[in-house]
Amino acid sequence: MSLGLVGRKVGMTRVFAEDGQSIPVTVLDMSANRVTQIKTADTDGYNAVQVAYGSKKANRVLKAEAGHFAKAGVEAGRGLKEFTADAAKLAELKVGDTLTVELFQVGQLVDVTGTSQGKGFSGVIKRHNFSSNRASHGNSVTTRAPGSIGQAQDPGRVFPGKRMAGQYGNVKRTVQSLEVVRIDAERQLLLIKGSVPGSKGNDVVVLPAVKAGA
């Protein structure tokens, strides 16, 4: 993992390229990423930067958290996130600094991680893209049933990992190699080509793409 930012999904819109092409983009608000701690291999066993993101009411902050934020001299955040970084990058940062969208460049590929939208309890057709059974000719109650889920007496159980009905969505997902279309440094906005996981207002983590050179 390399240095990145934590932000919130604002929503989707579109922008027009110079040739008139309409490009669908997701707007991400990446403001208020404040460095709260710098970890080094000598003191912590690894190199990393801890950042606080978002904001939180003072009466909602635990005493331990309040002390940590006060020691760093930053406003209390909604949460903390660590990004690993090399020693050279750590030397450029200090506690209390603010990370901005200038970490990225237009045209750069990034990986975006978020929590996908929850769809509730869903059947196997919606959840796992199973095919439905026949809707007539003697089939009355098993049109959307999963079918056999295992053998009989031997082994007499359902194998772990069997695809069945259950909670659909609301899981951590990463979309890789999305292009940064525009950067609004004044409002700390990133416009990413395509869609990213989650609903409006959800937290997302943006990192340089792992497979950018592939």
Curated annotation (Swiss-Prot):
Any Pfam family matching the protein: Ribosomal_L3
Key words, A-Z: Methylation, Ribonucleoprotein, Ribosomal protein, RNA-binding, rRNA-binding
Signal peptide: none
Entries under InterPro entries matching the protein: Ribosomal_uL3, Ribosomal_uL3_bac/org-type, Ribosomal_uL3_CS, Transl_B-barrel_sf
GO biological process: translation
GO terms under cellular component: cytosolic large ribosomal subunit
Comp. bias regions, Polar residues: 132-145
Modified residues (N5-methylglutamine): Q153
PROSITE patterns: RIBOSOMAL_L3
NCBIfam families: L3_bact
Similarity comment text for this entry: Belongs to the universal ribosomal protein uL3 family.
UniProt name for this protein: Large ribosomal subunit protein uL3
Organism: Laribacter hongkongensis (strain HLHK9)
Gene giving rise to this polypeptide: rplC
